[in-house]
């Protein structure tokens, strides 16, 4: 309504120009000098300021020779000077006021009534800032004793995968938690798989890390394996003891033969002497 009232009070030429601003919709017609003068008068007398578009210029267009032919750009990029004295210095309302003169006056009056507006704006900007995300504290690395490592390694040699009851028993016997035992077993299994693959053997687990069928030994298989290992160790001890006894048996006949070999050359001269003592046969 305000815009229509001001248009009625204006001259007939301006009213006619307002009713039919553009003859055509060509770029040259829109940016012509006549249209430029019309928008300049609107900006000076604040007639329907919402119709005047004033985008914030990204760079200066005055130096470009190709844009000097369009005088409307100077009107669009021009900032209003009518209400510049009403804008409080240092406030955050300047970009809003430069776009809309009517809103500029209302905002200036509101800022004059509330002197603590700057503090409110700063507090709102502080609350809008996102709080920094706190990092999750890193879990400390468990340091195992030598006795615990020996117990874990011995159990791992017998059983590569632990059930929940076995894990609980092992954790209680070594003074550890189930999580510590589980983590150690996971790391140890990874080393074991790498060693198996380096040796040129088939991977003991599936691609997703699950154990293959019959790869987890049962308690009966573990006991049978222990018996076989003990029997193999006892056989090795017997063989080693027999090897140590064999050199003593082989040395005895050699010792007996040595005096006989030495005595043989001694008897030969005696036989010759006896033969020489006999008288020669008569011819």
Curated annotation (Swiss-Prot):
Entry-linked InterPro entries: HD, HD_metazoa, Homeobox_CS, Homeobox_TF, Homeodomain-like_sf, HTH_motif
Region of interest (Disordered), residue spans: 107-141, 198-283
Compositionally biased tracts (Polar residues): 122-132
DNA-binding region: 139-198
Source taxon at top rank: Eukaryota
Molecular function GO terms recorded: chromatin binding; DNA binding; DNA-binding transcription activator activity, RNA polymerase II-specific; DNA-binding transcription factor activity; RNA polymerase II transcription regulatory region sequence-specific DNA binding; sequence-specific DNA binding
Keywords in alphabetical order: DNA-binding, Homeobox, Nucleus, Transcription, Transcription regulation
Biased composition regions of type Low complexity, renumbered to the chain: 268-277
CC per GO annotation: actin cytoskeleton; cytosol; Golgi apparatus; nucleoplasm; transcription regulator complex
Single Gene Ontology BP annotation: negative regulation of transcription by RNA polymerase II
Pfam families documented for this protein: Homeodomain
Expression sites by tissue: Nervous system, particularly in the telencephalon, spinal cord, and dorsal root ganglia.
PROSITE patterns: HOMEOBOX_1, HOMEOBOX_2
DNA-binding found in the keyword field: yes
Compartments reported by the entry: Nucleus
Keyword DNA-binding applies: yes
Function field: Transcription factor. Binds optimally to the DNA consensus sequence 5'-YYTAATGRTTTTY-3'. May control the expression of neural adhesion molecules such as L1 or Ng-CAM during embryonic development of both the central and peripherical nervous system. May be involved in controlling adhesive processes in keratinizing epithelia.
Family as reported in the entry's similarity comment: Belongs to the BAR homeobox family.
Protein name (Swiss-Prot/TrEMBL): Homeobox protein BarH-like 2
Organism per entry: Mus musculus
Lineage of the species this protein comes from: Eukaryota, Metazoa, Chordata, Craniata, Vertebrata
Gene behind this protein: Barx2
């Amino acid at each position: 309504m305000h815009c229509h009232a001001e248009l009625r009070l204006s001259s007939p030429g301006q009213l006619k120009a307002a009713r039919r601003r553009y003859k055509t919709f060509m770029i040259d017609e829109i940016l012509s000098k006549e249209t430029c003068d019309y928008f300049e008068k609107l900006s000076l007398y604040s007639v329907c300021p919402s119709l005047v578009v004033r985008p914030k210029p990204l760079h200066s267009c005055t130096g470009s020779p190709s844009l000097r032919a369009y005088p409307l750009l100077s009107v669009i990029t021009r900032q209003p000077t009518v209400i510049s004295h009403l804008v409080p210095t240092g406030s955050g309302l300047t970009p809003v006021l430069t776009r809309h003169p009517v809103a500029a006056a209302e905002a200036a009056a509101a800022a004059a009534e509330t002197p603590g507006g700057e503090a409110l704006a700063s507090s709102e900007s502080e609350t809008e800032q996102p709080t920094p995300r706190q990092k999750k504290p890193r879990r400390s690395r468990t340091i195992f004793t030598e006795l615990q490592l020996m117990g874990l390694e011995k159990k791992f040699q017998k059983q590569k995968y632990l059930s929940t009851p076995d894990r609980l028993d092992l954790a209680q016997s070594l003074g550890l938690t189930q999580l510590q035992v589980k983590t150690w077993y996971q790391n140890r299994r990874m080393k074991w798989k790498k060693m198996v693959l380096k040796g040129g053997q088939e991977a003991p687990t599936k691609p997703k890390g699950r154990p293959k069928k019959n790869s987890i030994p049962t308690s009966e298989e573990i006991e049978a394996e222990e018996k076989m290992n003990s029997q193999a160790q006892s056989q090795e001890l017997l063989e080693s003891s027999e090897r140590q006894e064999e050199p003593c048996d082989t040395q005895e006949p050699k010792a007996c033969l040595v005096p006989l070999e030495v005595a043989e050359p001694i008897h030969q001269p005696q036989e010759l002497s006896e033969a020489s003592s006999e008288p020669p046969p008569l011819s």
